[in-house]
Curated annotation (Swiss-Prot):
Source domain of life: Eukaryota
Glycan-linked positions: N89, N175
Residues in compartment: Cytoplasmic: 1-53, 114-141, 198-208
Pfam families: CASP_dom
Family according to the record: Belongs to the Casparian strip membrane proteins (CASP) family.
Species: Arabidopsis thaliana (Mouse-ear cress)
Any single GO CC term annotated in Swiss-Prot or TrEMBL for this entry: plasma membrane
Protein's UniProt name: CASP-like protein 4A4
Keywords linked to the UniProt accession: Cell membrane, Glycoprotein, Membrane, Transmembrane, Transmembrane helix
Assembly information from the UniProt record: Homodimer and heterodimers.
Length: 208
C-alpha cells in the first residue's frame, strides 16, 4: 500500500514538472524578441535628440557672435568727452539713451548665449552635469523669448535714432550704429529659430 502511494505521487508530479520545463523556453523567447524590436527605434530617437541639441548649440553660438559684434561696433567709438565739449552732439554712444539701450541689450544677449553655449558643450561632454534637462528646457524657452523681445525693441529704438540724426559731427557713430543694429536684428532672427527649437523640445517633453 505504501509503494502504491509512492508510485501515484511520481505519476502526478511527473507531467507537471515536464510541463514546466517545456513552458520555460516559450516564456524566455518573448522578452528577447521585444528587446530586439525596441532597440532600433530607441537609437533613432536618441540620435534625433542629439541632432536637435547640436542645432540649438550652433544657433546659440551664432547669436553670441552677433551680439558681440553689435556691442563692439558701438564700444570702439567711445571717446571720453571733456567738460567743455559735453554737448548733445557728442560722438560717444553713452550720451544717447537709445544707443546705450542697444549696447546694454547686446551685452545681455552675449552673456546669456555664452552661458547657454557653455552649458551645451558641457551637456555633450559630461551628459548634463550642470542643470537637469527638464529645468533647462523651461529656462531656455522663457529666456529665449525675453532676449528676443529685448533685441527687437532695442533695434527699433536705434533705427528711430538713426533716421533722425544727420549731423556730420557724429557720422562715424551713425555708421557704427547701423552696423550694431544690423547685427542686433540678425541676432534676433537667429535666436528666434533657437526659441522655436526650445518650444519644440518642450512640447516633445509634454507629449512623452
Amino acid at each position: 500500500m505504501k509503494e502504491l502511494k509512492d508510485h501515484v505521487v511520481v505519476i502526478t508530479y511527473g507531467p507537471s514538472s515536464e510541463a514546466s520545463v517545456t513552458a520555460s523556453p516559450v516564456s524566455q523567447q518573448t522578452p528577447s524578441l521585444f528587446a530586439y524590436s525596441v532597440t532600433p527605434s530607441a537609437s533613432r530617437f536618441s540620435s534625433r535628440r542629439a541632432s536637435v541639441h547640436v542645432i540649438g548649440l550652433v544657433l546659440r553660438f551664432i547669436t553670441m557672435v552677433l551680439c558681440f559684434v553689435s556691442a563692439l561696433s558701438l564700444a570702439v567709438n567711445v571717446q571720453r568727452p571733456s567738460k567743455r565739449h559735453l554737448t548733445q552732439n557728442s560722438s560717444s554712444f553713452a550720451s544717447y539713451p537709445e544707443l546705450l539701450y542697444c549696447f546694454g541689450v547686446a551685452v545681455i544677449g552675449f552673456v546669456y548665449t555664452s552661458l547657454q553655449t557653455f552649458k551645451g558643450v558641457c551637456d555633450i561632454t559630461h551628459r548634463g552635469v550642470l542643470i537637469s534637462e527638464p529645468l533647462s528646457d523651461y529656462i531656455s524657452f522663457i529666456f529665449d523669448q525675453v532676449i528676443c523681445y529685448l533685441l527687437v525693441s532695442s533695434s527699433s529704438v536705434a533705427i528711430a535714432w538713426i533716421q533722425h540724426i544727420n549731423e556730420d559731427a557724429i557720422k562715424t557713430l551713425r555708421n557704427n550704429s547701423i552696423v550694431s543694429v544690423s547685427m542686433s536684428f540678425s541676432a534676433f532672427l537667429v535666436l528666434t529659430l533657437s526659441g522655436l527649437l526650445s518650444g519644440y523640445k518642450l512640447c516633445k517633453r509634454f507629449m512623452w
